[in-house]
Amino acid sequence: MDKVLVTGVAGGQGNLVARRLARAYEIVGADRTPWKERPRELRFYQLDLRKRRFEDVVRRERPHAIAHLAFIRHFEEAPAVRHQVNLAGTKRVLECCVTYGVKQLVVFSSAYVYGALPENPYYMDEGYPLNGSRTYPDVRDLVEVDTLASAYLWQYPEIAVTIIRPVNVLGYSVHSAIGRYLQLEYVPTAMGFNPMMQFIHEQDVAEAIALAIERRARGVFNLTGPGAVPLKVAIAETGGTAVPLPEVLARPAVRTMFRLGLYPFPPGAIDFVKYPCTLDGSRFAAATGFKPRFGLEEIFASLRS
């Protein structure tokens, strides 16, 4: 049985990916924090990917594939720490793949790397420029991770590098920024804007990562769910009340509250509730046969629970 190492396995999405892959592979998990929901039969290493011990684990375990989900995506951590963990951790994973003959690497990127800009076309494909850091410097690390992994994709053709850029992920287990935003009772929005947004269920994301490994998909892929809805529909369907605010007041207020630790999102996030960032997921569907199993109603219901 082939072996898969799942980094970030203690997180909600990593845990789901490990459990899905365990149906067909021997699973080894790694994370900085304890894996509280670890099935007893699966091995786990609590470690920092940036440290030498991670390389020791890869050398000893010799995984066939690595599913890399060990990223800090919230903004509660210091920016320098987030950047170090995300970028230096990914570089260490990539180097270990080259050194120890890992055959496949799946990197869990984000749709946020494209950025939310007024000139964005609807349903961007994978060739669209990565503008995320132009107006949202707080996610610059995600853009750099995606770019770094893309370079390995071409430099090391013997490794099937798969970069997956999912749209907004919601579910019972994941703790995404968009999930926290939609769980607010009164949800601030930018007055005069109501962009189309896409969502995907966490279980479908786990299935997509498993399919990427099973089909040895190689390349950069958008990952989309069952469709798109206006932001205010998503707010209503998840039980919130939209509160439109003039941007001239909202942006400085968000900047101040974020700096003081009173609001969880930096001001750059405002653009994602103004402008569209919708993706075309047809390439991944063609490469793997992926079809989302969860509809929008089930996705939104998972947030209301």
Feature map (PLM): residue ranges:
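Active-site Tyr-X1-5-Lys
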Residues: 134-162
